[in-house]
């Protein structure tokens, strides 16, 4: 049952929470995460927001933008995205302009389940660690998603350790967008670990466990960050919504949320990815398609090397066929894609639909892309 009693329903829907968020959910999260990971969290380490997009609006404006150094001096600080492409929703959250610095990825050819035709993005640490903005104190935070929207890439434990060390070296936080990651919804297939300490800000969401409409985001951070987020909640929303908290709290307390993630959500999307890969190989196996190694999330990232048109044009062509994808160039936040052809050769494809819809869309992608390559040969 969603509500244990009429009194419980009145408490959750008829009253505001405090600006930090619903106390029962915060307590349940504290107990759950300490039990799973041994982090020694307290309620002072957790704040709730009205969705993870709301959380990133707060965090990117707290750590990025214009900072006053003295009465007559200010400095612009950017959010550093250590590996682009990244989540398109980050792009416009700053109140004043865009404040991002991004690094192009290293592209490595890999196999997936014994098959060729795949690649994986790696962080280019040589380029990252030599960024002038880092050396000049013009970076306010480092942020990455894991698994990554749009590619399904999962940064390795080694990459995360180096990003953590880099953030600490420069006295800035490492923000990790965990919307698709462990422990819920756990749409992640790589053998990796999840770490936290007070220089790391972890962001979670209830959206990918099937509750996007309740708009519940979760921030795990140092107490001073939680206090700042709570103050912003008070100004912007008075308090976060409690409906998602009412649903999630008992599911965390009795372990059903983890069971749902491990036994239903994760296997479903893994099977969807396998099905989509097989269909893409069938439709475009003889053409220059490369697929980012599916390591998590609910998308596939497709690279059509030397595509005769831009991914934006491909989007328009597929839209006319009744199939929607997202052009890759929009995900390279902070990078000038005019000088980076790879960005214009990639698309993001959702795998969340039923198999019949998935096959229909992939058949359309195959038909249009084959036509483009075949026309280019003439």
Where on the chain are the PLM-derived regions?
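Conserved core of the PLP fold type I
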Residues: 1, 7-170, 175-197, 201, ...
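N-terminal basic, amphipathic alpha-helical segments
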Residues: 1-5, 234, 240, 363, ...
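PLP-dependent enzyme catalytic core of the Aspartate aminotransferase-like
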Residues: 23-27, 31, 35, 39-40, ...
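Generic structural signal for small/hydrophobic residues in well-ordered secondary structure
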Residues: 29, 46, 80, 142, ...
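Active-site PLP attachment segment
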Residues: 182, 191-231, 239-243, 358, ...
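Structural signature of PLP-dependent enzymes
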Residues: 230-236, 254-278, 307
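Conserved glycine-rich beta-strand-loop-beta hairpin in the small C-terminal domain of fold type I
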Residues: 263-277, 289-304, 342
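Short, conserved charged micro-motifs
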Residues: 308-314, 356-360
